[in-house]
């Protein structure tokens, strides 16, 4: 699968993603590990306020979040989706987790992709599995 099927955009933020080619390769590796391929995956980096409004409009939730994932897939095993990530939340969460912004962002990038492969994070057990999958995904990075 061509790696140009993963796109990065920004809304209401000046954030510039570095190492795009390496990140695309890594995300494709995660998908392949889960026996999925990526047809089209859009990551949209945005502000807290932008994502809060989306959370209100689309999910009827009135709180800040770091990520919202929309699954547009029509065929099992073929990923199509839009993932909105609040750079403000990522930066704050990195501090809270005593992590770097880069590592926290990569965790969130993987988290959204893992949702599109079927992993959930509502229950304690699901959260534990998601965290383990995020950790495994981070260990696949070669950059």
Curated annotation (Swiss-Prot):
Keywords from the UniProt entry: Cytoplasm, Endonuclease, Hydrolase, Metal-binding, Nuclease, Ribosome biogenesis, rRNA processing, Zinc
Gene Ontology biological-process annotations: rRNA processing
GO molecular function, one term: metalloendopeptidase activity
Cofactor note: Binds 1 zinc ion.
A Pfam family of this chain: YbeY
Record-level GO cellular component terms: cytoplasm
EC number: 3.1.-.-
Subcellular location as annotated: Cytoplasm
Binding site for Zn(2+): 111, 115, 121
Cofactor(s) recorded in Swiss-Prot or TrEMBL: Zn(2+)
Gene3D superfamilies: Metalloproteases ('zincins'), catalytic domain (3.40.390.30)
Broad class of the protein's primary localization: cytoplasm
UniProt function note: Single strand-specific metallo-endoribonuclease involved in late-stage 70S ribosome quality control and in maturation of the 3' terminus of the 16S rRNA.
Family under the similarity heading: Belongs to the endoribonuclease YbeY family.
PANTHER family found in the cross-reference section: ENDORIBONUCLEASE YBEY, CHLOROPLASTIC
Protein name: Endoribonuclease YbeY
Lineage of the species this protein comes from: Bacteria, Pseudomonadati, Bacteroidota, Cytophagia, Cytophagales
Gene: ybeY
